[in-house]
Regions:
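Sequence/fold signature of self-assembling virion shell proteins
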Residues: 1-14, 131-158, 166, 186, ...
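Assembly/oligomerization interface modules of large self-assembling protein complexes
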Residues: 2-77
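Non-transmembrane, amphipathic alpha-helical segments
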Residues: 51-55, 84-87, 91, 275
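Short helix/loop capping segments that flank catalytic or ligand/cofactor-binding pockets
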Residues: 74, 108, 199-201
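Alpha-helical scaffold segments that mediate packing/assembly in large oligomeric complexes
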Residues: 80-171, 320-329
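Generic, well-ordered alpha-helical scaffold segments in large soluble proteins
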Residues: 102, 106, 175-178, 203, ...
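C-terminal amphipathic alpha-helical
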Residues: 103, 107, 187, 191-192
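Amphipathic interfacial helices
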Residues: 173-177, 181-191
Length: 330
């Protein structure tokens, strides 16, 4: 179950750090320190970066199964009445094949991107994963409003969801070339949603046709022309107009300093097997000055949350054959 920290797709683009409840990086950059020699003490060099406090969040898992319920399913071969419910192969199977994937989906689709922390009013209420922590998009939206995190925000940011393919190509190209000169030599990702990625690729193809007119094999691929920056889709950004770019070392996934086992207890209550688990997880950015982002005014990450990243385009039916979320005019 420790795979929860590397099993969700965005994890590989982040740098893991450990802390108890909060993490704050040490300032690591200063203004110019070299000067002409003189025989007098004339100190120079002030800390330049704004270290951002990253909040760690404690999450829990309460999940119950009744192993006997699988008696009429294809999982019957994993049901062994000679064993106690918590020792049955079916119990372990459900942890690895059902519980863990569900945790990873919650993390990717509801928590690390669009999550917005909301404290429970009543501890007995069933919590929602999207209210258990602040995600990347929420952090950027709130920082754009407060203006106190030192982040480089693209001025007059455009909502690229309504832009044409050609406009997306032009916008991202300008975004990439406006990143400060000291970062232009670094190989970094420009993170965006799958929808914006497709718009960029279609617009690029329409502009250049079959080729870009150059022998450089990077042209026409995911690298933005004449830069060291490559487009990278994050699943957690589904339906989002936000794009951002930062070194991997600045993109933080926070764990607990003394991380416990995720599944902390398994209890038998009559025929039911109950799983108790907990883990810590937070996300954020170490330094605002190392982050470049385009965040359009009025965007609400929570409004786009869904279990699977879907929109209202598809008609969905439930087990009773009833249509859910029908498309308007369909």
């Amino acid at each position: 179950m420790q795979d929860i920290y590397r099993g969700f797709t965005t994890a590989k683009f982040m740098t893991p750090k450990r802390a108890i409840e909060t993490y704050k990086a040490v300032r690591s950059d200063y203004t110019s320190v070299v000067q002409e020699f003189s025989a007098k003490w004339t100190p120079s060099g002030d800390a330049r970066f704004t270290a951002i406090k990253i909040q760690n969040y404690r999450h829990k898992i309460n999940f119950a199964i009744v192993p006997a319920d699988v008696a009429n399913s294809w999982l019957l071969s994993l049901y062994n009445e000679r064993l106690s419910p918590d020792q049955m192969p079916i119990t372990r199977y459900i942890v690895q094949k059902i519980l863990l994937p569900s945790i990873l989906q919650d993390i990717e689709m509801k928590m690390i991107g669009k999550g917005k922390y909301k404290a429970k009013e009543n501890p007995t209420d069933v919590g929602k994963p999207e209210e258990s922590m602040n995600g990347i998009e929420t952090l950027l939206v709130e920082a754009a409003k407060s203006g106190d995190k030192g982040i480089n925000f693209y001025p007059n940011a455009k909502d690229l969801r309504t832009a044409t393919d050609a406009e997306v190509v032009e916008y991202i190209d300008d975004f990439a070339h406006k990143i400060l000169a000291k970062y232009q030599s670094l190989k970094m990702n420009i993170f965006l949603s799958a929808d914006l990625y497709v718009k960029y690729k279609r617009g690029y193809k329409d502009k250049w046709g079959a080729g870009s007119g150059t022998e450089n094999p990077d042209f026409g691929k995911d690298r933005v022309d004449f830069t060291n920056f490559s487009l990278q889709v994050l699943d957690c950004l589904y339906g989002s107009p936000i794009i951002f770019c930062t070194p991997k070392s600045n993109f933080i996934m926070l764990q607990n300093l003394n991380q416990p086992q995720v599944i902390t207890d398994i209890q038998k209550v009559d025929y039911e097997v109950r799983y108790y688990g907990e883990f810590w997880l937070g996300v954020g950015f170490a330094f605002g000055e190392m982050l470049f982002a385009s965040v359009p005014t009025g965007y609400d990450p929570q409004a786009a949350i869904s279990d699977d990243g879907s929109t209202d385009f598809w008609k969905k039916t439930n087990t009773a054959g009833e249509v859910e979320n029908p498309t308007e005019g369909a």
